[in-house]
Amino acid sequence: MCGFVGCFDLNSGSAPIAQGLREELRAQVLEMSKKIRHRGPDWSGVYTGENAILSHERLSIVDPLSGKQPLVSDDGKIILAANGEIYNHKTLRAQFDGKYQFKTGSDCEVIIPLYKKYRATGDFTAMIEELSGIFAFALYDSENDCYLIARDEIGVNPLYQGWEKAGR
């Protein structure tokens, strides 16, 4: 199983986060990520943006050569860190043929175009119901400055959420 760590809402409040604090938070996220490296010894990746940091420790099962995470959408605006197996990924991939330019063969990449499909309506329950499998993920939409954290309905893959003093 893979593992991931994220920090969102870095700019919560009226003032943007100071660069020094962003780097401090990035270091903390990387330190937390090191603690779960045993869950994904094949690849470590990190995304650092204006309002989010995502780190991923990958265990390569599907697409070991190009499925490095965090995954980034074809337009560069959506970032995804996921742990799971999407059993119906081939069916979902076919659904988005010609509508989304997949960058990898990763089964989890289908979460990105699925999110884009449901983003306008905000019906993310319907989005999750389209996914068959065991999964947990954190997705950051940099264009709309929002995030979605979800897991499968049974909760096979662990997913923990918390906040620090400033509410991030």
Describe each model-derived feature in a short phrase.
Residues 1-168:
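N-terminus-centric sequence/structural signature that marks the extreme N-terminus
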